[in-house]
């Protein structure tokens, strides 16, 4: 039996709602402490000597939709789901490090210029999209099957099947 889309949406909200509340009430600060311990040394190796956390901290919440999508996607095997979660979380952490570097390169390294935000904006878009891209890569077979079930078959494929 397949799960209906509204049930999947409800499961997603039931998972991400409490996680978002937790994130806004202390989770971000806990994660930021981990980011300082693990991410700052990486940033220092990349030449970052000053850091404005306000440019990056708000984007760090993107763990939550990734986690929710990975948990509610039907048809993912246990191993693929578990390994996907682990690898995805690591990649999202590294994307936060790269976004911090991009912020530094856009605003701090060369001084704040009129085009600093224009240089930084693509990084924000990539940071927001990255968890969804990782999820789509991990769940590609499931997504392809779902899409093939809802897309009408073209006339040429229908004709070739009847021949």
Task: Describe each PLM feature range.
Residues 54-78:
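Hydrophobic alpha-helical transmembrane segments
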Residues 30-51:
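Extracytosolic (periplasmic/ER-lumenal) interhelical loops and adjacent juxtamembrane/interface segments
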Residues 19-28, 94-106:
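C-terminal TM-helix exit segments that contain a strictly Trp-centered aromatic cap at the helix terminus
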Residues 2-31:
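N-terminal signal-anchor transmembrane alpha helix
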Residues 14-18, 61-70, 130-136:
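Hydrophobic alpha-helical transmembrane segments of multi-pass integral membrane proteins
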Residues 83-94:
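Central hydrophobic cores of alpha-helical transmembrane segments
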Residues 2-3, 74-84:
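Membrane-interface helix-boundary motifs at transmembrane edges
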Residues 100-156:
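Alpha-helical transmembrane segments of multi-pass integral membrane proteins
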